């Protein structure tokens, strides 16, 4: 198969073509004339020149480019591990349907003390006498795997054997420890189904990525996670002491060990939505409660916000409604970025666009951090000053109304309420975890003062 790559969504060529600013975080690559031809080929999806590997390896390592496709792995090289907590006939039927879609692959089902009996043909079934959690269930199955690759698949997702083999094909590059597809949510025409199809925490979007903490895609859910078995065992598999966030922890340990993790949204696997608003809010709370434990293992990686100081001041001015102040800081930010990026030789238009995108992105991230972490503080502060109240109101309403206008849900009022309350539930979980671990570090932002673009 001809090797081809696709540029990252953040890709800015220099005016003379002898450099590119790309990836997440942004990295600048200065290239020779030969390197410029390689960049041209990547942009046009043409055959790559010979001796491209030195440059393309550097681009791959920073997420500036991504593999365009992969060859399917052999079915004999993949074992599927399914952690299962079966509670009723419907969840058992879902498991049977999942296994039927994986015919041709070795399958291990680990029943984690399921209250409903698990009777499955076409798979090896292991039973835990006590409920040990999904991390332990996966590890029990992984310990039995003798193949090169292992696919961890949750029982409430739909995925085919062909999709898993395609994902495993990305592991032909031994630097890649794991790869995950896009996890979409089944829209069953109920309100919950519709809401989850728009705002599922498992759906990481449509843009491929090299996964790293504090980047555009900073983690992978273990809903469907295809791994190099040796790499997985080298880093110690899943941490069984974590009932939540064990997949995030595993990805971060891999990246800290120098291994690559890839997100491949071209492959989509639908996931069943929660059955009620109460279950949805409980899920968000649980996810939030994992932040403190993750921060304990990976200091500052679970921060609610990472931002450049100048961008942050501009974003704060916008959310406070201080338009005249915001205009000044927006102008200063654009001037600063245009000046600091002068060595990249990208056009002034691209530099201005980058600065503007940074302002917009930071404003969105600040609003998200306020709602998903700091809203109790802003609520208390609003009793003393009206500015925090303005920021809290903007952070709650602007994203929700924007989503209402963009998606046009069938239940607009309920959509607005659940959109706001789900974020507040996540924040409540973050605070609960911080109190439980007696550490506030997971509540603190990471503010940088230097240019975050590397060369």
Segment roles from a protein language model:
Residues 84-103:
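Short, well-formed alpha-helical segments that are part of the catalytic scaffolds
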Residues 1-41, 61:
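Acidic, low-complexity/disordered tracts enriched in E/D and polar residues
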Residues 59, 248-300, 331-358:
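Catalytic donor/gating beta->alpha subdomain of glycosyltransferases that bind UDP-sugars
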Residues 315-432:
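Membrane-embedded multi-pass helical conduit in multi-pass membrane proteins
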Residues 150:
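Short aromatic/hydrophobic "clamp" motif used to bind/position activated sugar donors
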Residues 127-145, 207-218, 223, 253:
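Glycine-rich, basic loop-to-helix element that forms the pyrophosphate-binding segment
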Residues 161-194, 272:
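Conserved donor NDP-sugar-binding/catalytic core segment of glycosyltransferases
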Residues 181, 196-217:
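Short, flexible, basic/aromatic active-site loop/helix in glycosyltransferases
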């Amino acid at each position: 198969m001809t090797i081809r790559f696709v540029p990252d969504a953040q890709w800015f060529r220099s005016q003379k073509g002898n450099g590119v600013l790309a990836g997440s975080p942004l990295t600048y690559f200065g290239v020779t004339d030969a390197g410029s031809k390689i960049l041209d080929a990547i942009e046009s999806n043409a055959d790559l020149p010979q001796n491209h590997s030195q440059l393309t390896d550097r681009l791959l390592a920073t997420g500036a480019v991504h593999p365009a496709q992969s060859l399917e792995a052999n079915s004999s090289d993949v074992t599927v591990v399914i952690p299962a907590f079966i509670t009723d006939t419907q969840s058992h039927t879902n498991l049977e349907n999942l296994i039927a879609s994986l015919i041709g692959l070795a399958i291990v089902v680990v029943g984690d003390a399921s209250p409903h009996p698990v009777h499955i043909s076409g798979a090896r079934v292991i039973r835990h006498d006590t409920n040990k959690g999904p991390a332990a269930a996966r590890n029990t199955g992984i310990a039995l795997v003798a193949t090169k690759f292992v696919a961890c698949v949750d029982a409430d997702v739909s995925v085919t054997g062909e999709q898993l083999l395609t994902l495993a094909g990305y592991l032909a590059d031994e630097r890649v420890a794991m790869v995950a597809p896009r996890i979409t949510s089944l829209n069953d025409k109920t309100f919950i189904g519709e809401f989850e199809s728009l705002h599922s925490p498992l759906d990481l979007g449509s843009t491929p990525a090299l996964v790293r903490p504090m980047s555009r895609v900073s983690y992978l859910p273990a809903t469907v996670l295809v791994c190099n078995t040796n790499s997985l065992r080298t880093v110690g598999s899943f941490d069984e002491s974590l009932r939540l966030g064990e997949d995030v922890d595993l990805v971060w340990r891999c990246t800290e060990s120098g291994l690559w993790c890839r997100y491949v949204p071209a492959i989509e696997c639908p996931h069943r939505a929660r059955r009620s608003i109460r279950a949805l809010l409980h899920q968000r709370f649980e996810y939030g409660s994992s932040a403190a434990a993750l921060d304990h293992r990976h200091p500052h990686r679970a921060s609610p916000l990472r931002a450049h100081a100048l961008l942050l001041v501009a974003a704060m001015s916008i959310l406070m409604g201080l338009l005249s102040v915001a205009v000044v800081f927006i102008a200063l930010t654009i001037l600063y970025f245009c000046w600091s990026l002068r060595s990249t030789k990208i056009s002034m238009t691209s530099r201005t666009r980058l600065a503007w995108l940074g302002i917009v992105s930071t404003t969105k991230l600040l609003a998200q951090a306020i709602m998903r972490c700091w809203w109790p503080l802003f609520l208390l502060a609003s009793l003393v000053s009206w500015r925090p109240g303005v920021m809290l109101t903007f952070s709650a309403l602007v994203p929700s109304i924007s989503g209402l206008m963009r998606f046009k849900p069938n239940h607009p009022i309920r959509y607005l309420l659940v959109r706001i309350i789900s974020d507040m539930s996540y924040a409540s979980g973050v605070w609960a975890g911080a109190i439980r671990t007696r550490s506030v570090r997971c509540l603190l932002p990471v503010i940088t003062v230097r240019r975050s673009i590397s060369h």
